[in-house]
């Protein structure tokens, strides 16, 4: 029996709806059970109406606080263990880093890392920009 589960990990729901909802719909049409772990703002009804299983996750889009990131990592590991997906699709830098670590801990071998959202890195003149 094959495990036809995909889990998307994205830092905020509106970004997923804007950039990855079409991919999720196609996977559902192919018979996959599709999950989304994300920070929920105002897109939950669109996500659920599409047929995705939504897992609320608090993840800041910026910042490098160790304790906050550690709490987020633990929450991601719990979701990965609960869902046990065949494939995780990690979108944007923070989900790629934390989701990649969580995938190692949970022995998920199917990992897609989609780097996007780098435009803001060119707007800041501080330590995190340029």
Annotate each language-model stretch with its function.
Residues 2-6:
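Extreme N-terminal starter segment of soluble prokaryotic enzymes
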């Amino acid at each position: 029996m094959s495990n036809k589960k995909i889990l998307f990990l994205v830092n905020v729901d509106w970004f997923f709806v804007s950039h990855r909802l079409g991919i999720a719909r196609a996977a559902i049409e192919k018979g996959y059970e599709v999950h989304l772990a994300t920070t929920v703002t105002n897109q939950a009804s669109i996500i659920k109406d599409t047929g995705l299983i939504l897992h609320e996750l608090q993840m800041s889009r910026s910042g490098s606080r160790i304790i906050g990131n550690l709490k987020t990592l633990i929450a991601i590991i719990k979701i990965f263990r609960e869902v046990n997906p065949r494939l995780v699709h990690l979108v944007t830098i923070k989900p790629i880093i934390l989701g990649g670590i969580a995938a190692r801990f949970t022995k998920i071998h199917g990992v897609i890392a989609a780097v996007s959202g780098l435009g803001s890195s060119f707007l800041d003149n501080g330590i995190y920009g340029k």
